[in-house]
Design a protein with these regions (language model features):
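Conserved SGNH/GDSL esterase-like catalytic core that processes O-acyl groups on lipids
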Residues: 1-59, 63
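Alpha-helical scaffold segments in carbohydrate-active enzymes
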Residues: 7, 60-63, 67, 115, ...
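Structural recognition of the beta-strand scaffold that forms the well-ordered cores
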Residues: 25-30, 38, 75-80, 133-136
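Conserved beta-strand elements of beta-rich interaction domains across eukaryotes
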Residues: 32-36, 63-64, 71, 83-84, ...
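A short acidic, glycine-rich active-site loop
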Residues: 49-56, 100-109
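A structural motif corresponding to the C-terminal end of an alpha-helix
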Residues: 63-75, 112-132
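Mobile gating loops/cap/lid regions near enzyme active sites that modulate substrate access
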Residues: 83-103, 118, 122-125, 129-162
């Protein structure tokens, strides 16, 4: 994320992107799924407790918003994470259930999402003339998971090997 931000900063500072265009543009942000998933990977490095880890992630998001705001961004959408603890790869993690979602992981996701929502709610105070939008993805995904046939016929996949 920092590399992309640096590239964007360079374009703005070199006037390769007009600031008025930046002010009219929409900025969509969704990040954090891999961070939460990776928190549960085995490691010899000590980890902070889950709350501290999520708070550090939220500081990174706020830093990102600070920086794009300074470059002229005024329309910013932050999207929540979906239920990371329900991805099939979670079954590969030590101690994770393979027949249901990984609750500990989704607790972190929900805390992170609440922090994002709070950031958007207070955006107008910290960032004058900015418009913040929160995209609540988690609940939408959970509705699809709970009742998939309500939204669409189930898909069937055929895999062919050659």
């Amino acid at each position: 994320m920092q590399d992309q931000l640096q590239q964007f900063r360079t374009l703005v500072e070199q006037n390769l992107i007009d600031r008025s265009l930046v002010q009219k543009s929409f900025f969509f942000f969704e990040a954090g799924s891999n961070d939460i998933f990776n928190y549960f990977l085995p490691s010899n490095t000590p980890k902070p407790d889950p709350h501290a880890y999520v708070q550090a992630m939220l500081v990174e998001v706020e830093t990102f918003v600070d920086q794009i705001y300074k470059f002229g961004a005024r329309k910013i959408a932050l999207f929540s994470l979906g239920p990371v603890g329900c991805v099939p790869a979670r079954a590969l993690l030590p101690g994770a259930p393979n027949n249901r979602c990984y609750g500990k992981m989704n607790v972190m996701v929900k805390e992170y999402n609440l922090g994002l929502e709070s950031l958007v709610e207070h955006m107008h105070i910290k960032y004058p003339h900015a418009i913040g939008v929160y995209g609540a993805i988690y609940n939408i995904v959970q509705k699809f998971r709970a009742n998939p046939t309500h939204y669409r016929k189930p898909l069937s996949f055929h895999i062919f090997y050659s």
